[in-house]
């Protein structure tokens, strides 16, 4: 009974949106299929596909490098690589715009070191970059956990048969972590289609942007867009649940009688790829974690110095917090 009540409570907003679309002044079918409705839907799906695909590749690569190779300091990297999750996308996007623009502290520090980081973060490219950097941990965390728990027998057999590490990864490891990659990618997809702050700052109009913009003067269109967003989210959630259950069943079949985690995961020596791998991990952490932190620290220091000079200090009340 409790589950039914909870489900009904969550279904009420969706039912209200559908009722408003059906009872609107325009034909629901014409409204849902009009170019002004489908255009933001296409942009949203385009951005979500790009972000989820990039996050899948980046998160999987980082998970493999930090859990299955002899990367220098990999225990440290395993701690800091998922930390960009602490930044809300809106805060991260604002920090990027401020820090990497000419005159920003990160831009100026890089210029002093001989690097040119001048870039205009806006539109599809800016939204894609920011959302990828702050959502790849949704792929990294489940993939890293899966890599750490895989039985080593399959990989050992492949190596004994003469397969190189890259071939072992593609033929043995990747099929076993595929469900984790797919589930994490769908979470990134869902996060992207529901995001408002980052796309707003990047001036890229998606469903959430258009819903907010049309909520006062074109409510029929606003509710139609909200219904599309709701249906898209439900499809993604259903797909994620299906893939997670299928992955659990596949994992049980693959492991069989083997005890998961009974031996340490095999370590792949990086060799000549040690420097590029370290550069990849350090570069991602620098962009996604350190760069926004520097910008936020610069904002805080600027506010403190302003208050010391007699200016208005930065104040927050409960309305701002809540």
Language model region names:
Residues 1-25, 35-148, 176-197, 221-242, ...:
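Membrane-water interface segments at the C-terminal ends of transmembrane alpha-helices
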Residues 27, 203-213, 292-298, 306-309, ...:
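Short hydrophobic, aromatic-rich alpha-helical segments embedded in or entering the lipid bilayer
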Residues 150-153:
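Short glycine/proline-centered loop/turn elements that form peptide/ligand docking sites
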Residues 156, 164, 249-267, 304-317:
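Juxtamembrane inter-helical linkers in multi-pass membrane proteins
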Residues 157-158, 168, 172, 211:
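Hydrophobic positions on the alpha-helical face of helix-turn-helix-like DNA-binding modules
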Residues 161-163, 175:
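Glycine/proline-centered hinge or cleavage motifs at structural transition points of membrane proteins
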Residues 193-217, 255-256:
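Glycine-rich helix-loop "coupling/hinge" segments at transmembrane-helix boundaries
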Residues 239-281:
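Alpha-helical transmembrane segments of integral membrane proteins
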């Amino acid at each position: 009974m409790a589950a039914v009540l909870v489900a009904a409570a969550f279904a009420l907003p969706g039912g209200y949106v559908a009722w408003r679309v059906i009872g609107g002044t325009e034909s629901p079918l014409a409204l849902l299929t009009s170019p002004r409705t489908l255009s933001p839907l296409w942009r949203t799906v385009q951005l979500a596909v790009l972000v989820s695909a990039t996050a899948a590749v980046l998160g999987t690569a980082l998970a493999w490098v930090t859990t299955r190779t002899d990367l220098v300091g990999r225990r440290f990297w395993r701690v800091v690589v998922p930390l960009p999750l602490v930044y809300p996308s809106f805060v991260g996007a604002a920090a990027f715009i401020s820090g990497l623009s000419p005159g920003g502290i990160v831009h100026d520090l890089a210029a002093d070191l001989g690097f040119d980081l001048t870039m205009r973060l806006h539109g599809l490219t800016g939204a894609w970059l920011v959302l990828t950097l702050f959502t790849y941990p949704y792929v990294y965390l489940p993939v890293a956990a899966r890599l750490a728990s895989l039985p080593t027998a399959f990989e050992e057999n492949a190596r004994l048969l003469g397969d190189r590490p890259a071939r072992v990864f593609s033929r043995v490891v990747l099929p076993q972590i595929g469900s984790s990659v797919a589930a994490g990618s769908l979470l990134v997809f869902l996060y992207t289609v529901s995001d408002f702050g980052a796309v707003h700052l990047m001036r890229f109009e998606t469903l959430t942007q258009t819903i907010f913009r049309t909520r006062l003067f074109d409510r029929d269109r606003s509710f139609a867009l909200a219904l599309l967003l709701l249906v898209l989210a439900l499809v993604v959630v259903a797909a994620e649940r299906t893939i997670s259950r299928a992955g659990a069943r596949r994992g049980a079949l693959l492991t069989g009688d083997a005890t998961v985690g009974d031996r340490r995961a095999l370590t792949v020596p990086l060799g000549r790829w040690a420097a590029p791998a370290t550069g990849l991990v350090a570069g991602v952490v620098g962009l996604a974690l350190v760069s926004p932190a520097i910008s936020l620290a610069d904002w805080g220091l600027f506010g403190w110095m302003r208050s010391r000079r007699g200016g208005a200090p930065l104040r927050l009340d409960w309305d701002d917090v809540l």
